[in-house]
Amino acid sequence: MPASPSPSRFAGLDGLRAIAVGLVLIYHLFPGAGVHSGLVGVDVFFVVSGFLITSLMLRPSTHSLGYRMLDFWRRRARRLLPALAVALTVCASVAWAIGGDVLVGIGRQLLGASTFSYNWVALAGGSDYFAATEPELFRNVWSLAVEEQFYLLWPLLLPLLLVVLRARWLLVAFAIVAAGASAWWMSVLVGEGAVTRAYFGTDSHAFGLLLGIALAFALRDMPDRAWMHSSAARVGGFAIGMLGIGLIVVAALQPGHPAGSGFPGTLLLASVGSLLSILAGVLPGSWFGRAVDVQPLRWIGDRSYGIYLWHWPLLVLVLAATGQGVSAGAAGVPVLSGWVTLVLAVVIAAVSFRMLETPVRRLGLRRSLRAIGARFKRNPLTRFATLSALVAALLALGGTTAAVAMAPPMTTAEATILAGQKALKNRTAKPAPHPEPTPTAIDGNQITAVGDSVMLASAPALYERFPGAFVDAKVSRSSWKGPGIIDALAASGALRQHVVVALGTNGSIDRRVLQKMADEVGPNRDLVLVNAYAPRDWIPGVNAELQAFASVRSGVVVADWSGAIAPHEDLLAGDRIHPGAAGGRIFAEVVEKGIRDSEAERAARPHRTPEPMGY
């Protein structure tokens, strides 16, 4: 007798799904709530899927292998495709009605979502999961693509493994080693800076699925021992389950890692917590499984697929319709927008579960249509509802077609960045040794500017205001790149009198990096640190660190881009980060004020040397 109950219904899995989708919802809809790594909910889903699907496939059957494979794929299609088709067409149609940035790349997204290859299609298209320059209406289906690729390949590989590795411990060892290899590959990719590739890749993000597989192998045909039903075993199992939930929560509360520095550690922590929770739930006589499967959590868990499927597109649409940008930061989602999205996602998922997913899953598509046809003949209300649904379906298909046809080639943020790149490419100014300082005038030939995509978007305005300035700006550049760039310019004699640095948009700033840049600039030049403005949760810390450093270091001032642009968000692109032409002029004004402040500070200390760090 197996230790676990019938694979058709494992205790605790619905509750675990509810916890997983809850973490993802908080992470996306309420990013200021402190669940900075709520994306680990996806890894909980992966572990549950790996365990559940493998357990189902290991169940004894009298049917042939080919029949079982086809039956498995048919049931997966019934479960996933109807809701996905409705979500894609409805959301694409609404996006067409809204227009603008939300339509960018929608054809590619629909292709990836409908073929369950979204993760690879997105990578081929240069998508950056951790950037905010492109909304990507269906970005969340990348994880569904990973799972579907698993559903396609695993039924083909499992029979071969069962023949080659017959012993249970060999199967468990194989799955654990494969999971370790996947996690190692993610760490390698993250180390190379390919964070989105590491996160999206089926090969590099398969460790959760593989750990779930390992647990399914371990519990296969496990004998039911008397001690498993003892009070001590039940209490111990409950403690193990709570430890698992605790590990998941701890992982979700880890600080955000914009550069992926927490990968794969944080994701592995949540995966191990999921393993412990599943194990505690499926043990005979377990209290934990029943405790986690309380009715509210079970209700959410049953509908977790639909809630997850709908929540992100709805969030993008709500923010687009209300003129807000889409970002992963704490300021990126107004609380009201988060609640509106949550209510819509839960209501739509509940209706979809009852009216669409459950009938198709139980009866199949053809039998469901026959049942509707039979009621259509007898019931006027059914006739009205059916005709309304047909009209809505036609409108959704038409709207989806229009969305693809009318999608703009790039977002407003990408357009501003492209303009900056063209300005850099066409500039005539060349880096040259800085001239002797002039008393008060700001000459572009005295300026070296190093920055990220915000400075890049402002490059045309900088060249207009400071002809001859040298600007070195690049998309996704972090503060860690600053010292190397400044050091190279100084070594070549090309570092000018006024050094302007704007590198706070893409992650936190370490005071050691600021110290190194200031040392390289030296006591005879001015260092202007431009603070940051973006709907990202690390921005307040960045700006505070810049201000604190400038307050104790001579020759360093802060240019307040945040304060200058905050009242003029309408001058930013749709992502609420990158300035357009008018916003770029404000950026240039901020830089000019910063340089004048640095000149005034230098004039007040004609013979002073740099002060030591005071903290």
Question: Which sequence ranges carry the predicted segments?
Answer:
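Hydrophobic membrane-embedded alpha-helices
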Residues: 2-3, 9-13, 19-402
